[in-house]
Amino acid sequence: MSNAPKIKVSGPVVELDGDEMTRVIWKLIKDMLILPYLDIRLDYYDLGIEHRDATDDQVTIDAAYAIKKHGVGVKCATITPDEARVEEFNLKKMWLSPNGTIRNILGGTIFREPIVISNVPRLVPGWTKPIVIGRHAFGDQYRATNFKVDQPGTVTLTFTPADGSAPIVHEMVSIPEDGGVVLGMYNFKESIRDFARASFSYGLNAKWPVYLSTKNTILKAYDGMFKDEFERVYEEEFKAQFEAAGLTYEHRLIDDMVAACLKWEGGYVWACKNYDGDVQSDTVAQGYGSLGLMTSVLMTADGKTVEAEAAHGTVTRHYRQYQAGKPTSTNPIASIFAWTRGLQHRGKLDGTPEVIDFAHKLESVVIATVESGKMTKDLAILIGPEQDWLNSEEFLDAIADNLEKELAN
């Protein structure tokens, strides 16, 4: 272990513990890669399913407000209970997704960013840099009213102004004999503007250009508002900073963007409407080869608050092996990057470049360790049958050794 003085992290980091195999790995990461090198104040919340149940989920709410207060959270993967989990843990009720609860309290946009490692094959080999998908997690199909009708009739859309002035009425369609389906959806200008701010803040931070995709040629008013508000926020609030950093912003049609993304090498932020983001984030994750190499960062519109976590689940299958006393080969990379992304933001808020530098070094050490042929089983399988692999602790040992060397330089 290093005898060098620990690097001081000025502000606190809110730590959200989780479940199953990721909880085991999370503690190893903290004990082997974080605490030996950093003098850090951790504001700890146990979001393990039993503790959420014991506190009636109050711990999740408290954790979210702590992140709001301190500006940085790092989160371990958690169980979102279904019927089987309610039975397994004898839960009082089927608690909501902690991620949803935290997002509702903090607001903001979720950005999913792949970790690119040169010797891990990608389904899309040309993607040599990350594509970051920012998904507008509000409105559209996800807050829509939709229903079925089984007889002929008329569908009308009515907007009734709050000031009592004349309503706006659109007769949409006459439904024929056989019936059909109807969908009414909406979005709010303020939410779109906040989404734009978060997307531009992320781009500025990562030093990558930003693209927004819509279908404004068809939805002239609806998607037109996304296009116009992004343009306005960019011109008024970000253009000067973008140009100074040599960055660009562009709106593109969704079909054009999907085609372009397959041709381009990556290295940009792709701001997607709610449904597009839902679909494209999974397409992109698969294209890079592994959810085990995908980080997820929630960033608020003002760019001041960040919560980082791995984009994968709690790895239940490995946890069952672990409970049986067998070694597992669980990929810790996305969880390590949750720590590093949180630390980078903490360093930025505090004005402590040495903290940011430590986080960057840890990231490059992780990538270099895999590129040197040391990795967990999931990555070895992607490379091929000849590739050796390490168990979880051996891989973390290899990273710790390499980090030790890197920091000594």
UniProtKB/Swiss-Prot annotation:
GO terms for cellular component: plasma membrane
Thermal profile of function: Optimum temperature is 40 degrees Celsius. Retains about 40% activity at 60 degrees Celsius.
Record's cofactor remark: Binds 1 Mg(2+) or Mn(2+) ion per subunit. Can use both Mn(2+) and Mg(2+), activity in vitro is 12% higher with Mn(2+). Banerjee et al. detected activity with Mg(2+) and Zn(2+), but not with Mn(2+) or Ca(2+).
GO terms of biological process kind: glyoxylate cycle; isocitrate metabolic process; tricarboxylic acid cycle
Keyword Acetylation on entry: yes
Site (Critical for catalysis): 142, 215
Activity sensitivity to pH: Optimum pH is 7.5. Can tolerate a wide pH range retaining about 30% activity in acidic pH 5.5 to about 90% activity in alkaline pH 9.5.
Entry keyword set: Acetylation, Glyoxylate bypass, Magnesium, Manganese, Metal-binding, NADP, Oxidoreductase, Tricarboxylic acid cycle
EC number: 1.1.1.42
Binding, Mn(2+): 255, 278, 282
Reactions accelerated catalytically: D-threo-isocitrate + NADP(+) = 2-oxoglutarate + CO2 + NADPH
InterPro entries: IsoCit/isopropylmalate_DH_CS (IPR019818), Isocitrate_DH_NADP (IPR004790), IsoPropMal-DH-like_dom (IPR024084)
Cofactor: Mg(2+); Mn(2+); Zn(2+)
Entry GO MF terms: isocitrate dehydrogenase (NADP+) activity; magnesium ion binding; NAD binding; zinc ion binding
Sites where the protein binds NADP(+): 75, 78, 80, 85, 313-315, 318, 331
Activity regulation: Activity is repressed through acetylation by Rv2170.
Function: Catalyzes the oxidative decarboxylation of isocitrate to 2-oxoglutarate and carbon dioxide with the concomitant reduction of NADP(+). Cannot use NAD(+).
Subunit: Homodimer.
Family: Belongs to the isocitrate and isopropylmalate dehydrogenases family.
Identification of the protein by name: Isocitrate dehydrogenase [NADP] 1
Origin species: Mycobacterium tuberculosis (strain ATCC 25618 / H37Rv)
Gene name per UniProt: icd-1
